[in-house]
């Protein structure tokens, strides 16, 4: 996986709640022009759980096409880490095969939610999906949403026994897990999935981030990651601290509710539309977002 900085993309909707494909392409191009290495369509932040199978695949297709046809400032191509998560292994497998066929560089697969599988079930789930494709696979551990964690021993077993399982997105909130994973397998790539811990994870064995805040501030997220990769601890910490209040504000309600509203307030999407059961943020949250964006001079 030849990338380090990436954003977990929101999925913009029109007022009729259909996917706004034109707006989606614009958002991806903004990521490209502001220095991100990769984009992550249709993950948690992309509201994948309320997209149809057809919409899910179309979002991956748009991301691949946009990245293929738009050069970065360094004349390279931004990578696509396609979200293929589902609580049904068969559906994830189908999405994984599609992502590979359409040209995604790698896939991100979350643990099945609601089912609460055993560790053996998780192992078989990930192994089955990974063996159906040739492109790299990133595990995604976010127990607050899935109800079950990929234990360190299970993650290590997957990395050791399934050749194209190359990385894990850590959104467990546990630095202990990060240090254990890195200690036992230095080549197992760890990506931060928790914006408030980006700096800490990068300096505890992490090699990159998948950021929600990056939708709004891709340039600063990219700069922080690049500083960390060069072992510029203090410079990376200064950027992390600069983003502290924004990271906090973007998670006062369930993601992606705040980031979508923030993107709307910043003029980056026309409609802050959500599909039920997600709803617009409270008036208090909107006021907080407005105040925070003013502090960052995103709006006046």
Curated annotation (Swiss-Prot):
Gene3D superfamilies given in the database record: Aldolase class I (3.20.20.70)
Active site residues of this protein: 140, 169
Pfam families: DHDPS
Primary localization class, coarse: cytoplasm
Top-level taxon of origin: Bacteria
Positions of the record's site feature: Part of a proton relay during catalysis: 44, 114
InterPro entries given in the database record: Aldolase_TIM, DapA, DapA-like, Schiff_base-form_aldolases_AS
Pathway assigned in UniProt: Amino-acid biosynthesis; L-lysine biosynthesis via DAP pathway; (S)-tetrahydrodipicolinate from L-aspartate: step 3/4
GO cellular component: cytosol
GO terms under biological process: diaminopimelate biosynthetic process; lysine biosynthetic process via diaminopimelate
Positions that bind pyruvate: 45, 210
Record-listed E.C. numbers: 4.3.3.7
Entry GO MF terms: 4-hydroxy-tetrahydrodipicolinate synthase activity
Subcellular location: Cytoplasm
Purpose: Catalyzes the condensation of (S)-aspartate-beta-semialdehyde [(S)-ASA] and pyruvate to 4-hydroxy-tetrahydrodipicolinate (HTPA).
Subunit structure: Homotetramer; dimer of dimers.
Sequence similarity: Belongs to the DapA family.
Name of protein: 4-hydroxy-tetrahydrodipicolinate synthase
Organism: Helicobacter pylori (strain Shi470)
Gene: dapA
